[in-house]
Amino acid sequence: MSRKIFQRQEYSIYRCSDGFVVHNTNKKFENGHTHVNNFYKAKILVIMAIKREIDDKLSKRDIESLIRLTNDNRYRNQLRDLLERLE
């Protein structure tokens, strides 16, 4: 069983047995969550999703996580463009 340890706006972070789960509570859990290994990374993803920040230093995995978390179509398209440039 996981326990919520942090929330900012619509994003919640849960502690689970294998790390942390970030969930956008405005989306269904299946489509709006991602798993990360540490709390710091989870908070960074939440802050980036809220501020709709793009960073060229993001890993492919982080970009995919932000795509899953965000509701903003414009931001999602910018992230997809960045992901295509990395591939």
Features from the language model and the residues they span:
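Short N-terminal "domain-start" leader segments
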Residues: M1-V21, E30, D56, N71-L86
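Short, well-ordered helical secondary-structure segments
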Residues: S2-R3, N37, K41, I54, ...
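Short helix/strand-capping connector loops at secondary-structure junctions
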Residues: H23-E30, S59-I63
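A short, exposed loop/beta-hairpin motif centered on an aromatic-Gly-Thr core
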Residues: T25-L45
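Residue-level detector of alpha-helical secondary structure
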Residues: K43, I47, K51, L58-K60, ...
